[in-house]
C-alpha cells in the first residue's frame, strides 16, 4: 500500500520551517528558509511577501534534496503563520506595499480609536491591539491613501503563501480572529466592523475551518517539487493555534504554558468565552466548534536573561544555584514589566521593579524573585482566564524556560495544578500544520489526530508551600497600581 506524506509549512518572523511527516505522524525531516525584518522607521516592522515565497522555496528544496521520495508522496499540506500581518493585494493580484507585521506599532493611535468604538470588543471579543490587522488598514487609509484606494484583498501572511500555492483567496478562523474584523462567536466576517475601516467583505478572503480543504497545490509547483498526485492544502492556523494542534491542546480542559521570550497561557474551549477587559485573547481555534483563550506576558525568559546580563552569570547557572527543591518566597518581589504588560493590564507604559530589598537580599534571593515574578504574572493570566469561565486542571510546559524544574515547581505551586513536561520531540506549529494537512486530505477525526505528547515527567504543586506562595502572590498582585502611578 502506498504510504502518503504530509507537509507542514510554518511562516515565522525569522524564517519558514517545512516539516514532513508520514501517516503515522512520524516526523521524516524538516528544513528551513531564513527571513529578515525591515525596520525603516522607529516602531515599524515589515517584510516583503516575495521573500516568504523565496524562503518557502529554500525550505522545500532542502526537503527535496534529503527526502525526494517522501516529498513525492505528499497528499496534504498544512499552513501556519505569524498572525495579524497586513498583506495588501491589488485587483491584478500584485502586492501593493511591504507587509506590516504583527510587532509593528505605528498604528497605536488608530487602534485606540477603533477600540473606543464599543462594537469592536462586542463583536470580536477582544481589545483592538496596535498589532492587529484592522488598525494597520486604518493607518494606510490615512497615511497612504493612494495605496488604500487600490486594495482589492487583504491577506494574512500564511494566506498569501496559500495564494501562491493554490491561486485561491482563502483564510481560516483562528488567524482571522486576530484581525479585529471577525465575529468570533459566529465565525464569520463582520460587515459592520469592515465598514468602520472603509472596507467590505469583498476585500476579505473566503473563510473555512482549519481542518477543511482550502485549495489544491498548483500543478506547476507539484511538478517542480516532484509531488506525484493531488495535494490538498488545508485551511491551517495562526501560529499559536497551530502550536496547540501540535501539542494536542484541542479539547476543553487542555492547556499549555509557554516560557519563551514572552510567556503564554493557552487554553482550549468548547464554547466562546470573551472577556476583553482582562486583555485575554478569545480566538477561534483551528478545529470546528472550538475556541481558545490566551493570556500573554511580555517578559518571561526575557526577564531572566535581563537579570543574567546584570549579574554576568548564565541563566542556567543562576537557576542552578537555587537547587531542585522549591524554596519559600523570601519577601523580595519582582514585577517583570520590562517592556510593558499585556494580560491582564494591557499597559505598554508600565515598567518593572524589585520591591522589598534588604541587606540579606543576595543574588540567589533576586534570582528566586525573578522566577517568582514571572510565575505570578502567569498566575495573573490564570485568574483572568478563570474569570472568563475557563477551567484548567493541569498544564503542559514548553519553551526554553521549561528546562528549569525549579521554575516549573514554582508555577505548579502558584497555579495549584500539575505541570507536565513532554517527552523530547517536535510539537511546534509546523507539526500542528502537518496534522491539519493530514486531516484535510484524509477526513480523519481532528481529536484523534491531535493527541497530546507523551509525558516525560510531571511536577506536582508543593502543598507545604501553597500558603506562602499564595501570600507572596497577593503581595505581587497588589503592586501594580502603585507601580503604575510611578510609570505613567
What are these regions (language model features)?
Residues 67-102, 127-133, 162-183, 206-209, ...:
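Short beta-strand-loop/turn "lid" adjacent to the catalytic site in phosphate-handling enzymes
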Residues 12-15, 73-75, 80-82, 133, ...:
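Short, basic and Ser/Thr-rich N-terminal targeting/leader segments
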Residues 6-8, 108, 112-127, 138-170, ...:
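Active-site core segments that coordinate phosphate-bearing ligands/cofactors
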Residues 196-203:
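A structural motif corresponding to the C-terminal end of an alpha-helix
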Residues 1-98, 122, 150, 222-223, ...:
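N-terminal glycine/serine-rich phosphate-binding loop of ATP-dependent small-molecule kinases
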Residues 25, 48, 77, 104, ...:
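Residue-level signal for inorganic ion chemistry
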Residues 68-71, 80, 201, 249, ...:
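Alpha-helix termination/capping residues and helix-transition junctions
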